[in-house]
UniProtKB/Swiss-Prot annotation:
Residues the entry annotates as binding GTP: 32-39, 59-63, 81-84, 148-151, 185-188
Required cofactor(s): Mg(2+)
GO molecular function: GTP binding; metal ion binding
Cellular component annotations (GO), alphabetically ordered: cytosol
Function text: Necessary for normal cell division and for the maintenance of normal septation.
Domain of life: Bacteria
Protein name stated in the entry: Probable GTP-binding protein EngB
Record SUPFAM superfamilies: P-loop containing nucleoside triphosphate hydrolases
EngB-type G domain sequence ranges: 24-207
Family: Belongs to the TRAFAC class TrmE-Era-EngA-EngB-Septin-like GTPase superfamily. EngB GTPase family.
UniProt entry keywords in alphabetical sequence: Cell cycle, Cell division, GTP-binding, Magnesium, Metal-binding, Nucleotide-binding, Septation
Name of the coding gene: engB
Keyword GTP-binding set for record: yes
Record bears the keyword Ion transport: no
Amino acid sequence: MSFLLHQARFFTTVNHLRDLPPSPQPEVAFAGRSNAGKSTAINILCNQKRLAFASKTPGRTQHINYFSVGPAAEPVANLVDLPGYGYAEVPGAAKAHWEQLLSTYLQTRSQLRGMILMMDSRRPLTELDRRMIEWFAPTGKPIHTLLTKCDKLTRQESVNALRATKKGLDEYRAAGYQGELTAQLFSALKRIGLDEAHELIESWIAPGLAGDPDGPVAAE
């Protein structure tokens, strides 16, 4: 099966809000803790080995990377790789810059269609994961959680992690969050959940071009 995300390439790097590209194409943001496997997940979703890079020093990369998707001459969307968060040794000034950059981007970017939130399946819904959800909540846009590294769990542990995450997301629904909140298990190493994630992301950015000929299917 051919997926639109497989036509991805580096576009630009942004370190300040004023440098965000003015392009009107829809965007999907990828967020997650520094050790949640975000870069690896982006690479496997785009069927490339070195599209997204993880910093050698976790938490030190404080800029936003853009990857254009679709034909090179006429891209149809952008994937937006946000800085990883949660690394204890990040200096205070860098952390403040990160918080300002991410929170403002997530809350005000009109091109943004939704957020893919990466969580380590062994430690889902940390305090900082919840902060990301709460930053994004006022927009009413969808959040889809990838519970990464699920290959490190037993089948029952995976079931429990997914159930606990969905229960946690239900709390935001009960509190009045208007956007769609979904979650799935994911493993870049074992290629678990790839088709499900592909179809959902492409349903956000280009429903008519999604890889499933019968239309994209959203995760539960």
